[in-house]
Design a protein with these regions (language model features):
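Acidic/His- and Gly-rich active-site-bordering loop/insert found
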Residues: 1-86, 91, 95-112
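Acidic/histidine-rich catalytic neighborhood of metal-dependent amide-processing enzymes
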Residues: 92-151
Length: 151
C-alpha cells in the first residue's frame, strides 16, 4: 500500500500552499490508524496525535509540497500536473512518515508516550512551518520533547 501511495502522490504533486489532495489523503490514513487528526494547520498542514500512556512527546515531520518543474523522467507514474513535480522527494517523505505511523501504531504495546506526526505544507517557499506555529500548532498538540524531521 505504501508504494501505491507514493506513486499516487508522485502523479498528483501540489505546489506550496495548495496541498489539499495530499492533506486529505494523509488525514484519512491517520484516522484509519486511530490517530487524533488536526487539519488546516497553517493552511494545508496536517497533524496526527497518538497518546499512548506517559512518556516523552516525539514529533516526526515530513514536508508535502512539490516544485514548479516539468517532469521528464519517463516513469510510469510521472506527474500528471503540467509544470509541477515532486523533484525533491517530498512525496517519499510523506510515505515514509505514513509508514512510520503504521508501524508505531501496530507496536504501541512496545512504547509509551505521545507521538505527533506533522505533515508540513509550503516547505519550498519557507513559509509552512512558521504558518503552522502562528496558527496555534502548540495550542492544539503537545509541545514535543524531541523533533525528528526529514529533508
Amino acid at each position: 500500500m505504501l508504494r501505491q501511495t507514493y506513486e499516487d502522490l508522485h502523479r498528483h504533486p501540489e505546489l506550496s500552499g495548495e496541498e489539499h489532495r495530499t492533506a486529505a489523503l494523509v488525514s484519512s490514513r491517520l484516522r484509519d490508524l486511530g490517530m487524533q487528526v488536526h487539519e488546516g494547520v497553517g493552511g494545508t498542514g496536517v497533524v496526527g496525535v497518538l497518546v499512548n500512556g506517559t512518556g516523552p512527546t516525539v514529533l516526526l515531520r515530513a514536508d508535502m509540497d512539490a516544485l514548479p518543474v516539468t517532469e521528464d523522467t519517463g516513469l510510469p507514474y510521472t506527474s500528471t500536473v503540467p509544470g509541477v513535480m515532486h523533484a525533491c522527494g517530498h512525496d517519499l517523505h510523506v510515505v515514509c512518515l505514513l509508514g512510520a505511523a503504521q508501524e508505531l501504531t501496530a507496536i504501541r504495546q512496545a512504547w509509551s508516550g505521545t507521538l505527533v506526526l506533522l505533515f508540513q505544507p509550503a516547505e519550498e517557499t519557507v513559509s509552512g512551518a512558521a504558518a503552522m506555529v502562528a496558527d496555534g500548532l502548540f495550542d492544539e498538540v503537545p509541545v514535543p520533547d524531541v523533533v525528528l524531521g526529514q529533508h
